[in-house]
Amino acid sequence: MLFKQCCEPADLCKAINEQKGRRGIVKVRELVEYADGRSESPLESEARLVFIDGGLLMPELQYEIVDRCGKLWRVDFAWPDAMLVAEYESMEWHATPEALRHDRMKVARLQECGWTSIPMVVDDVRRYPLDLVARIAAHLNHATSLAG
């Protein structure tokens, strides 16, 4: 709702406060602080919750990177200090030949600029969240050790 600009954060909070006594509303109140209109899909929001639960540094959302040819690329999640990105790849959005070409070009161009890209699919987020956190944490730790 926030991404589609159907409501503002204040509207969301007001609606939540009007739900006093409803089952599950306490959990909703705890999670609303993590709502971010920059998430472009429900799975991106779920992935952010996995990152939070896993104790990862919060990434920049919808981060823009300009490659060596001047082309602008936007990534789902970025940790700029570590030159690390993570991209959620849904089967619906990324399954066509055109989308596959675009994704491969994007990863190649980002790698040419020194970025590491971690792909994520629904199973990473929903079935193996600890493995996903470990993969990202390993890359973040490696980048920190190189910088230090």
Where are each of the predicted segments found?
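Surface segments flanking catalytic/ligand-binding clefts of nucleic-acid enzymes
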Residues: L2-G148
